[in-house]
A protein has these predicted regions:
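Radical SAM enzyme [4Fe-4S]-AdoMet core and its adjacent flexible, acidic
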Residues: 2-10, 147, 152-298, 302-308
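Short Fe-S-cluster ligation motifs
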Residues: 85-101, 361-383
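Membrane-interface junctions of multi-pass transporters
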Residues: 303-345
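Local cysteine-cluster metal-coordination motifs and their immediate loop/turn environment
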Residues: 54-65, 332-349
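N-terminal pre-core extensions flanking Radical SAM catalytic domains
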Residues: 1-70, 87-90, 268, 379-382
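Short, well-ordered coil/turn segments that N-cap beta-strands
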Residues: 93-96, 120-124, 145-147, 183-186, ...
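Canonical radical SAM enzyme core domain
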Residues: 69-84, 104-146, 152-159, 163, ...
C-alpha cells in the first residue's frame, strides 16, 4: 500500500504545490486528482461525442471525414438519441464532455446538445477547425462558456490551406482565432504535421505560437476507418522530420535541445521476461470513452474494440470496453526499460508496430532516436 498517496483532493493540491512550488488553478488540479481516482475505480468521467463525420473542409489525412454522398444512406444520430446517451453517461459519472466531428459545429442541433450538457453541470470542450467561429457563435460561447475551444491550424496562408484542406480558409480561421482570444475564451491550437503540409509546418507552428500560449503538436496520424486506402504510410512524416519539427518548437520556446550520440544511449528494453500487470496506461476505457457518430462506444478514436450503447445501454457498453482496457496486455520488455519514463505509451501507437503484448521494436528505436536528438530527456543521461 502506498502511504504517500493523498487521502483527498486537498492533500493532493498541497502535494502539487510542494512539488512544484507554485499555486495551481484549483479546478485543473482537482480534475487531475479525479482522473487518477477514476482510472483506479473505472468511472467514466470523460466523454467524447463525435456528432458527425461531415465537415466543411476536406483534409486529405483526416481519419473520420466523409462527404454527404459517402454516408451511403446512413443518417446522423438525432439530438434526442445523443441526449439520452449523454444523460446515461452523466449518471455513470461523466463531468467533462468533448464535442467533435467531422466538424461538430455543422451538426444541426449543436446548440441543443451543448446547452443540455451545460444543464447537467458538465464542462464542455469543443474541437473545431475554426471556420464557423463567427461573431454569433462567439456571443453564444461567451454566454455559455466552454471549458476549452481547441482549433486545428492547417497552415499559415490560403495557398497552404487549399493544398491541405481543399479550401482557401486561412484568413477566416485566423480572424476567428483572434475573435476567440478577444472574447477571453480558453484556447488551444493544434498542428498536425503531414506530408501535404510539408515544410510549411514550421511557419504554421511559428504562427500558432504567436497566437496562443497553449499549442499541441500531434506526432502521428490516424488511419481513416471508413476509407483506410485514403491515407498511406508516406503521408505520415518520418521520425527525422518529426524531430526537426519538435526541435524547432523547442527553440521557439527558448529551449536548447541537448543532443547525444545515439551509441552512448542504452538499448531499449528491460530485464523482465514475464508480462507485467495488464491494462492500458492512458485513460481510454478506464476513465474516458468515445461515442462515434454511428453510436458505437470506443476506447479511443484509434483503437478497434467497440461496444453498442444504443442497443445495450451505456452502463453495459462501458463495462465491455472497460474490461478490454484493464486487461490489455503490456509488453514485458517495457518494464524496467531505460526509456519507460519518456516513451509514448499510447497503445494505439504500439499497435502500429506490434500486436498487443509484444515489444514494438520500431517504436523503441524511434524513442531512442528522439532521445539522441534532445527531444526526450532520458532520466540519468542529462548533460
Amino acid at each position: 500500500m502506498n502511504t504517500d498517496e493523498p487521502k483527498d483532493a486537498y492533500e493532493y493540491l498541497d502535494m502539487l504545490r510542494r512539488q512544484n512550488k507554485k499555486e495551481f488553478q484549483s479546478f485543473s488540479a482537482f480534475s487531475e486528482y479525479l482522473e487518477s481516482k477514476a482510472r483506479k475505480q473505472g468511472v467514466p468521467i470523460h466523454g467524447q461525442f463525435e456528432l458527425t463525420p461531415l465537415c466543411n473542409l476536406s483534409c486529405k489525412m483526416c481519419y473520420v471525414h466523409l462527404s454527404a454522398d459517402q454516408l451511403q444512406g446512413r443518417s446522423l444520430l438525432p439530438a434526442e438519441s445523443w441526449k439520452d446517451l449523454m444523460h446515461q453517461a452523466f449518471e455513470a459519472g461523466m463531468f467533462q464532455a468533448t464535442l467533435t466531428g467531422g466538424e461538430c459545429l455543422t451538426y444541426p442541433e449543436f446548440d441543443t446538445l451543448y446547452l443540455y450538457l451545460h444543464s447537467l453541470g458538465c464542462q464542455v470542450d469543443v474541437l473545431t477547425n475554426g471556420i464557423l467561429l463567427n461573431e454569433e457563435r462567439i456571443r453564444f460561447f461567451k454566454a455559455h462558456p466552454p471549458g476549452l475551444i481547441q482549433i486545428t491550424l492547417y497552415g499559415w496562408s490560403d495557398d497552404v490551406y487549399e493544398r491541405v484542406t481543399g479550401r482557401r480558409a486561412f484568413h477566416t480561421v485566423h480572424e476567428n482565432i483572434l475573435r476567440v482570444k478577444e472574447a477571453g475564451l480558453p484556447l488551444l491550437l493544434t498542428v498536425t504535421p503531414n506530408m501535404f503540409l510539408g515544410e510549411d509546418v514550421f511557419e504554421t507552428i511559428r504562427l500558432a505560437r504567436s497566437l496562443s500560449d497553449d499549442i499541441l503538436i500531434n506526432t502521428s496520424l490516424f488511419v481513416p476507418e471508413e476509407e483506410p486506402w485514403r491515407m498511406n504510410a508516406a503521408d505520415d512524416p518520418e521520425a527525422a522530420f518529426y524531430a526537426r519539427i519538435l526541435r524547432f518548437d523547442q527553440e521557439l520556446r527558448g529551449i536548447t535541445p541537448q543532443e547525444r550520440p545515439i551509441d552512448e544511449l542504452p538499448l531499449p528494453g528491460g530485464p523482465c521476461s514475464t508480462c507485467p500487470e495488464p491494462g492500458l496506461e492512458c485513460g481510454g476505457g478506464r476513465s474516458g470513452f468515445v461515442i462515434t457518430w454511428k453510436g458505437e462506444m470506443r476506447i479511443c478514436n484509434r483503437m478497434a474494440p467497440r461496444s453498442y450503447p444504443l442497443r445495450d445501454g451505456f452502463a453495459e457498453a462501458w463495462k465491455t470496453i472497460h474490461h478490454t482496457a484493464v486487461n490489455w496486455p503490456r509488453p514485458a520488455a517495457c518494464s524496467g526499460c531505460a526509456y519507460e519514463a519518456v516513451c509514448n505509451k499510447c497503445a494505439a501507437e504500439f499497435l502500429k508496430y506490434a500486436v498487443p503484448g509484444e515489444k514494438p521494436e520500431a517504436l523503441c528505436a524511434r524513442t531512442r532516436y528522439m532521445a539522441s536528438r534532445g527531444i526526450l530527456s532520458l532520466p540519468g543521461c542529462e548533460s
